[in-house]
Amino acid sequence: MKVILKEDFINLGKEGDTVEVRDGFARNYLLPKGFAVFSNKHNIEIFNQKRRSILKKQEAKKQMANDLKSKLDLVKLEFFMKSNDSGKLFHSINSLNIADELLKLGFDIERKKIDIHHGTLKTFGTYDVTIKLYEGISSIIKVEIKKEKKQEDKKSLSKKLNKADEQGERAEV
């Protein structure tokens, strides 16, 4: 079935494109949700008239993606994670964790646009993560996973400091 897309769709096409999709996908998803309309003579004429505004909108999206890319290229995320004695993380880092951290920094990035080359990050180190912003425009950010100090280390440090205070000495850390 041929439909005309009303907005950009990843792996399908851009707004105003006429695409061939399976009947069930069109009837059960694209048409009821308002993502597309049937490709008939009337709708084709309407979209031909809107083509100029669609192109302006796409150019504006491309410009916004370039601006966002220049800001994201400077971002470095740090995660402090707990691990077992062998150095394996108790919790891996995935695209949801990265999207949440980016949101805290003021970047509203959809989870599906974040591409972790290794699937999930399960060990300590620095990784390159790609964020797909627009067709042909992507940003690479650095994600660093560091070891979180164990609770025992914190307790022993505070005990040393308290003991030194009682004795009026300086604690060696």
UniProtKB/Swiss-Prot annotation:
InterPro entries: Ribosomal_bL9 (IPR000244), Ribosomal_bL9/RNase_H1_N (IPR009027), Ribosomal_bL9_bac/chp (IPR020594), Ribosomal_bL9_C (IPR020069), Ribosomal_bL9_C_sf (IPR036791), Ribosomal_bL9_N (IPR020070), Ribosomal_bL9_N_sf (IPR036935). Keywords: Ribonucleoprotein, Ribosomal protein, RNA-binding, rRNA-binding. It comes from the Bacteria. GO terms for cellular component: cytosol; ribonucleoprotein complex; ribosome. GO terms for molecular function: rRNA binding; structural constituent of ribosome. SUPFAM superfamilies: L9 N-domain-like, Ribosomal protein L9 C-domain. Gene3D superfamilies: Ribosomal protein L9, C-terminal domain, Ribosomal protein L9, N-terminal domain. GO terms for biological process: translation. Residues 150-173 are annotated as: Disordered. Binds to the 23S rRNA. NCBIfam families: L9. PANTHER family: 50S RIBOSOMAL PROTEIN L9. Belongs to the bacterial ribosomal protein bL9 family. This is Large ribosomal subunit protein bL9.
